[in-house]
């Protein structure tokens, strides 16, 4: 009877610790991010040991004693992802370095994404300079999807002010008329056959 209450008392003691550990996680960055930054900040060639990593986390205001297991899990996950490379030891005990290849692979991906955005921005001013092309593109867009049908209202406004825009608007206006005439022609022969 004396042995049974001891584990029961230990279980509620563990629960509040977990809750307390969860609270700081919400306010600050994840352990993995902190560990990655700490390893990146170190200048040791052989890599950062787990003890040194814990010290740097503690210096940054992270409670290492409460979240010791989380630090180990975070380090292991960073190694499996390829963010960190293990230079010595196995598992969470050992020395770790930032995987330069993984970091370099991420940077070009970001750079590649940035020029795409620039190209899109570059196309817009070019389109503004050549209203004829814009009108043609908008007409095509209007044919393809009914949602974009609102766009043809904008060239009409532009047609009132500059003369060039009116020239662009006229052929654009003619295209939908041709499209409208062609179905009528198809209907007439059908009526004649009947």
UniProtKB/Swiss-Prot annotation:
Gene Ontology, cellular component aspect: nucleosome; nucleus
Lineage: superkingdom: Eukaryota
UniProt biased composition (Basic residues): 15-26, 116-194
InterPro entries in the record: H1/H5, Histone_H1/H5_H15, WH-like_DNA-bd_sf, WH_DNA-bd_sf
Annotated Low complexity bias: 1-14
Keyword Acetylation: yes
Location of the region described as Disordered in the Swiss-Prot/TrEMBL record: 1-31, 105-194
Pfam family, one: Linker_histone
Domain spans labelled H15: 27-100
Molecular function as annotated in GO: DNA binding; structural constituent of chromatin
Modification Phosphoserine occurs at: 145, 161, 182
UniProt subcellular location: Nucleus; Chromosome
BP GO terms, sorted: nucleosome assembly
Main subcellular location of this protein, as a coarse class: nucleus
Positions carrying N-acetylalanine: 1
Keyword annotations: Acetylation, Chromosome, DNA-binding, Nucleus, Phosphoprotein
Similarity-based family: Belongs to the histone H1/H5 family.
Function: Histones H1 are necessary for the condensation of nucleosome chains into higher-order structures.
Name of the molecule in the record: Histone H1
Source organism (scientific name): Salmo trutta (Brown trout)
Upper classification of the organism: Eukaryota, Metazoa, Chordata, Craniata, Vertebrata
């Amino acid at each position: 009877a004396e042995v049974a209450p001891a584990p029961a008392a230990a279980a509620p003691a563990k629960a509040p610790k977990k809750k307390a550990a969860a609270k700081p996680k919400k306010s600050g960055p994840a352990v993995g991010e902190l560990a990655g930054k700490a390893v990146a900040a170190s200048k040791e060639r052989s890599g950062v040991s787990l003890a040194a990593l814990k010290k740097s986390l503690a210096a940054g205001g992270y409670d290492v004693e409460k979240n010791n297991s989380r630090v180990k899990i975070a380090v292991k996950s960073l190694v499996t992802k390829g963010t960190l490379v293990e230079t010595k030891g196995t598992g969470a005990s050992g020395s770790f370095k930032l995987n330069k290849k993984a970091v370099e692979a991420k940077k070009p991906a970001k750079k590649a994404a940035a020029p795409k955005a620039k190209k899109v921005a570059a196309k817009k001013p070019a389109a503004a300079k050549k209203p004829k092309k814009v009108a043609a593109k908008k007409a095509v867009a209007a044919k393809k999807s009914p949602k974009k049908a609102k766009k043809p209202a904008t060239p009409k406004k532009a047609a009132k002010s500059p003369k060039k825009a009116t020239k662009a608007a006229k052929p654009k206006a003619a295209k939908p008329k041709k499209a409208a005439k062609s179905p009528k022609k198809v209907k007439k022969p059908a009526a004649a056959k009947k």
